[in-house]
C-alpha cells in the first residue's frame, strides 16, 4: 500500500543527504583549497628566490 500512496516523482528521485547547493559549495571550497595548496608553496619559493638572488642584490 505504501508504494501506491507515494507519488511517482518521490519514487524516481533519490533522497540526498545534503541539498544540491550544499554539494556545490563543498565542491567549490575543495577546488579553492586545493588550488591554494598547489600555488602557495610555489609562490613562496619564487618570492624567496627573488629576494635572495645575488644579481638583484648587487653582489657579484
Curated annotation (Swiss-Prot):
Membrane topology qualifier: Single-pass membrane protein
GO BP term, example: nervous system development
TM annotation in the entry: 20-40
Keywords for the protein's UniProt record, in alphabetical order: Membrane, Transmembrane, Transmembrane helix
An MF annotation (GO) of this entry: identical protein binding
One Gene Ontology CC term in the entry: membrane
Primary location class: membrane
Site (Cleavage) location in chain: 19-20
Subcellular location: Membrane
InterPro entries: Smim3 (IPR035275)
Signal peptide feature range: none
Protein name: Small integral membrane protein 3
Native source species: Rattus norvegicus
Gene designation per UniProt: Smim3
